[in-house]
Regions:
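Short beta-strand-centered aromatic/proline hotspots
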Residues: 23-59
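Intrinsically disordered, low-complexity, charged/polar segments
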Residues: 44-47, 52-117
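Mixed-charge, Lys/Arg-rich low-complexity intrinsically disordered regions
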Residues: 1-12, 19-22
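Aromatic side chains
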Residues: 7, 13-14, 64, 68
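Short regulatory "switch" loops immediately downstream of catalytic or recognition motifs
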Residues: 15-26, 71-72
């Protein structure tokens, strides 16, 4: 059986993200008492991912299912390995497309987080 996968190992793509991020700690004072509070805001950005491996499961009836092992690309290298089915990987998401989607989602849903895939 000849099985062709849609994406190769090393394929990179971008996904939109919108979530709460703690941006600063405020020091509050009242009548001699002091305490801190973490302040968060919703941020929108694009995250790059890379395919590291491919898993193909062939069933007894001759059908098959393809999943991809994917890692996030960060400034520190790669992290957070996850498995995704083929249909959950976007074909041509550029950083600009993912960023625009994230910003649009944040504008339309100001209190909701979105993690793409």
């Amino acid at each position: 059986m000849d099985i062709k996968t849609k994406y190769d190992i090393g394929y990179t793509y971008w996904v939109p993200r919108v979530y709460k991020q703690f941006v600063r700690t405020e020091i509050l004072r009242h009548e001699g008492e002091e305490w801190t509070r973490d302040v968060s805001e919703i941020v929108a950005f694009a995250k790059q991912k890379v395919i590291r491996c491919v898993e193909v499961r062939v069933h007894m009836d001759g059908t098959y299912h393809v999943t991809y092992g994917v890692e996030n690309i960060t400034d520190a290298g790669t992290s957070m390995f996850q498995w995704y089915p083929e249909e959950n990987i976007p074909e041509s998401n550029t950083e600009e497309v993912a960023q625009a989607f994230a910003e649009g989602y944040m504008r339309d849903n100001p209190d909701k987080e979105y993690f793409g895939n």
